[in-house]
Amino acid sequence: MNLQYLILSLLSTTVYGGFNLNFDSKGDALEKAAIDFTGEDVAVIKENERESFGITDGPLKDACGKVSGRRPDHVWLYKPTLWGDMYTMYKWPEVTRTLTPIAARVVGKEQKPMIVSSQVYRNRSNRTVKVNGKISQEVTNTVENKWSKTHGLSVTASMTYSFKVVEASMEIGYTSEWGQEETKSESVAVGQEMGFESELQPGESVEAVLSATKGSMIIDVTYRATLDGCCAINYNNGWKGHHYYCYPIGMVQDAGKLKKHVDVKETIKIGFYSDSHVIVRDKHGKK
């Protein structure tokens, strides 16, 4: 099968945009596969996501202290805060978590011929006959995905998948949620038009064998979560002439040597049948 006919598209729609991934393999060589992806999911960081980045209250205060020279008494990543909500009052940006797909690549593929179905035709008459027949069999194309640990990320994006393999007559589409594992399938008939003709002498028989290539492809998609915005901090007794400060979260992460990103991997496996053909052979296996 010429894999240039395999196309994978992935779409996830959110308030802030969506994920789009297009796969197009230029021939049988994996190194020629081209995968394009765009999109993002942006949201104010959730409390449970703080642990994923190692910015719970204690480590965050320690890191802010390394920026300013003194550990603050209070620290916030989003509103509301105490004392009139500093984010609103000073128009400071809350800390947001941005998730984007950063890599998608084919990590494995396999193609192997197999017998899908067979049928024996016998001439039970006392004269020579011509046998005309067609053979077909229903097979199942599949798509399944698995996720690595989502590391406590709170992503509510819906994802719409579309998989097409032209030579395999495969077209599977469905909508899911980010982080949800699914297995989808479709039944297709192979060999529908695979007719044959054979002349049989009295008592002779032939076997019609329908074969196809069973293919599979594995694609890894890596999503990366990063942070933006500022930490609002308070010193009860003031520090360097002020009580309130806003430090960029990236600066704080660097100062505290905190985690700068969280990666999540999705593995997609596609299974399909292609290149069906019929072989007619006698009882000795001769074609």
Curated annotation (Swiss-Prot):
Keyword Isomerase part of the UniProt annotation: no
Record key words, sorted: Amidation, Disulfide bond, Membrane, Secreted, Signal, Target cell membrane, Target membrane, Toxin
Main location: secreted
Histidine amide PTM sites in chain numbering: H284
Subcellular location field: Secreted; Target cell membrane
Tissue specificity of this protein: Expressed by the venom apparatus.
GO molecular function: toxin activity
PTM comment, free text: Contains 2 disulfide bonds.
GO CC terms, sorted: extracellular region; membrane; other organism cell membrane
Signal peptide: 1-17
Keyword Secreted: yes
Protein family: Belongs to the megalysin family.
Function: May function as a large pore-forming protein.
Name of the protein in question: U-megalopygitoxin(8)-Mo12
